[in-house]
């Protein structure tokens, strides 16, 4: 055999041996290292992508004090889902609902109704919820003479101002005048209310209730409209609360939020004299802008109402305020009851009416039902399950 060929074969065999040896021994750490680095990278990526779960704490607390710093006991505080009462030192605590938008109190009879400002006398008894805020304190101002023994309550239905201009109005000299709805409401309705207040004996406490449909977005959404009607409603000496109506929301979250931004919670209460007023949103939308008529309540609202009334002394009179009549309507919820009166054919009473009456009948001071929506004034009386029930419908203003 050629000597050079032998040397070449030996070199090849040595190379193969070295390679085999390297694969068997030296390459194992290299493979492990690659695998370990890949695993570490995957673990790092997983940790990076998986955000830690932050548990939100919905526990809140606060106090209600008078201007002297004294705690106010026995005041109902709510988040719109549950109600609690302040203790003997005016303190309260609760676990608010994750969907709550306001923390607010039921204005006691011995205290002034707080307002947005000295020139905007719409009621401001609430604070907007913030996820960063855990303490909600309120300061109340005592009425100089204590709880009022008499007062006037001006109730109006459906201001329903729009963004559009109303039809032409005729001036005293027969010239046509074009006015916006807000201007018309301000120069006519509010002017009349101010004149009525002026005619009362000096010092008479005066309060107001709007029964909802403060606005209607006829002609498109207008972000300024709710604020404009609030400023008009708050421009007199009366301290005014408002119910929310169907046109204030029209089944759209944006519209409802704009009303809440200006007037606060939609389900609330307040006391004047020996009367406990409860205002509640009974506009139940089920298909776009369609709503049930008679009015209805959601189950969570029923729970809230039961809690509110359970914390209210039973010697009070209760006035339940809402927009759509509970005693009649012709676009009913499936569980609504047909009215039996011959002249009421095709009309129904709310599926909640029986429950509401059972809750209201607990109060020795009696009860009344206030609504709007109809645009005309009437006292609607029906015989319901053997009982005469009257509902006061307030005319559009």
Model-derived regions: residue spans:
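Short acidic, glycine-rich surface-loop motifs adjacent to enzyme active sites
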Residues: 309-336
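Extended active-site neighborhood of metal-dependent phosphoesterases/phosphodiesterases
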Residues: 108-116, 122-132, 219-312, 339-368, ...
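N-terminal active-site segment of His-dependent metallophosphoesterases
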Residues: 28-59, 97, 112-219
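Short, ordered, surface-exposed loop/turn motifs in non-cytosolic proteins
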Residues: 58-81
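Active-site-proximal beta-strand elements of phosphoester/diester hydrolases
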Residues: 150-166, 172, 274-286, 319-321, ...
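Active-site glycine-centered loops adjacent to acidic/histidine catalytic or metal-binding residues
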Residues: 158, 212-213, 245-246, 323, ...
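Short, acidic Ser/Thr/Gly-rich low-complexity loop/linker segments typical of extracellular
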Residues: 75, 81-95
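Short Pro-Gly-centered beta-turn/loop motif in secreted/extracellular proteins
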Residues: 70, 93-102
